[in-house]
From Swiss-Prot:
Keyword list, A-Z: Transferase
Active site positions, chain numbering: 328, 384
Recorded GO CC terms: mitochondrial matrix
Family, as annotated: Belongs to the citrate synthase family.
Gene3D superfamilies: Citrate Synthase, domain 1, Cytochrome P450-Terp, domain 2
EC number: 2.3.3.-
Reported biotechnological use: Phomoidrides A and B (also known as CP-225,917 and CP-263,114) are potent inhibitors of Ras farnesyltransferase and squalene synthase. CP-225,917 and CP-263,114 inhibit Ras farnesyl transferase from rat brain with IC(50) values of 6 uM and 20 uoM, respectively. CP-225,917 inhibits squalene synthase with an IC(50) value of 43 uM and CP-263,114 with an IC(50) of 160 uM.
The name this protein goes by in its record: Alkylcitrate synthase phiJ
InterPro entries associated with the record: Citrate_synth-like_lrg_a-sub (IPR016142), Citrate_synth-like_sm_a-sub (IPR016143), Citrate_synthase (IPR002020), Citrate_synthase_sf (IPR036969)
Gene Ontology MF: a single term: citrate (Si)-synthase activity
Amino acid sequence: MALSSQAQGKLFVRDSRTSREYEIPISNNTINAADFQKINLPTKGKSLTKALGLQLYDPGMQNTAIKKTEIIGRDPSTGLPLLRGVTSQELWKRRCDFEELFSLMVFGNYPTIVEREALRYQFAEYMKEVPKVVGSVIRKFPPSSPPLPMITAGLSAYLSSDPDFIPAIHGGNIYHRNPRAADEAAIKTAAVYAVVIGLISCHKKGINFVPADTDDTFLENLFRMCGLVDPATRRPDPHVLAVFRKGLVLNCDNGMTQSNLVLCATASSLCDPISCLISAISAAYGPLHYGAQEAGYRTLSEIGSADRVPHFLEQVKRRERRLFGYGHRTFATEDPRLNAVKGWLQELDFDSKREPLMKIAEEIDRLAAQDDYFTSRGLRANADFYTLFVFRAYGFDWDMIGAANFCMRIIGFMAHWREAMEQEIKIFRARDYYVGPSKKDPNRESSGTGILAQARL
C-alpha cells in the first residue's frame, strides 16, 4: 500500500566515530538496509569490518522487511486483512469460496465464473492423480502418530514420484519468471496437501479414504477426503462449509509470519513449492507459532477444570507455565479477528456444553482480563486462543487442528511462493553478529558444562 508523500525523504546520519555524514533515501517509510554498508571505519590494509560496513542487528527480524509485496495489507478502519486491496467484508459479502480466494491471492485477480469453474475442476483432477505411494507411506505410521511427520512424509512421497517437479533434478530453473509453470505448480501443491490431510485423517480414524470427485469444490472434496460428512448423505454439512469459507478470509494469510519467512527463504534458492511448503509447515509446528494451538489444547486438558484456573494463572505469572494464545506481535492491543472468531462459534452452536475445555478457556479469559499482570502488559486473548475450538466445531480432531489450519493458510503460502517467482531472486544470506573470542587455543581444556564436559568427569 503506497504511503503519502510525507513517507518519502532522506535520513541524515552522522557517525560520531568519524564525524562523517551520510544521506540515506526513505521510500514509503522504508530504508534500504544495504545503504548502511557505506558507513564504515577508515582503516589501513585489509579489514573485515571495513569490507562489511555497518550492520543492522535485528534479532527475530522485528523491524525488517524482507520483500515488497502486493498480497496482504491491513484495513486501517477495521484492522482486518486487506487481500490484494479487497476488504474482508467485501469477500464475506461475496461468499468467497476457496477457488475464488486462491485465484485472488495467488494469481492476483478475482476469477470470472468460467475461470472459477476451470480452477475447481483442475484442483479435483490433481487430487485424483495423487499416486498410491503417498497413501502407502502415510499408512506405515501408527495411527497415533502426530500429524507433522506424516505430513512431511506424505508430501515427500509425492515429490519422489514426480522428480521433474524438482528444479535441481530437472536440471535448473523451472518456475522463476515462468508464470504458466508456477501457476500449475501452485495449484498442484494445494491439491496434494488436501489429499495428504485426508489420508492422514482417515488413517488416524481407521476409516476408508474416499477420493475426490471432479463435480465438487475444493472444500467439499477436502471434507469428504477427511471423512467429515453426514452419515446419511455422505456429503459435508453446507452450514459448516459456509462458516469455514468465512474463516478462509481471515486465516489464508497473516503477512510475513515466521512460516512465510521460512517459505520465502526456501523459495529464494528456486525450490519447488512442495519443498517450500514442507519447510514452512515444519517451522510453523513450533509452540510459538501454529504449534501453539496443539500446545494450548494440551494445557487446557492438564488444567482439567475451571476451578483450577486461578492456580494456573499464578504459575504463568511466576513464569512456571506458558499461556498460549495470549498477546500478539502484530496486534499490540485487541486482536481485530477475535470478534469474528467468537461469532463463528455462535453460528456453529459450539459452546462449553458441547466442549468442556471451552469452559476452562473462557475462565482463563475472564480472570486474565481482570488481572493487572496481564492488562498492564497489554496481554489479551488473540484469535488463536479460540480458533482451535472453531476447528473442533468444523469436525476436526484435536490433534489435527494445526494440520487443518494449513488447509486455509496454504493459500497464503502459495501466494508468497508465486510472488517470489515473479520477483528478482536474491538468495537469503543473512549475517550474524559474532561476539566470540578472536583467538582461542584448541588444546586448552574447556570449563564448559555441556555433555562433553560431563563425560570428562
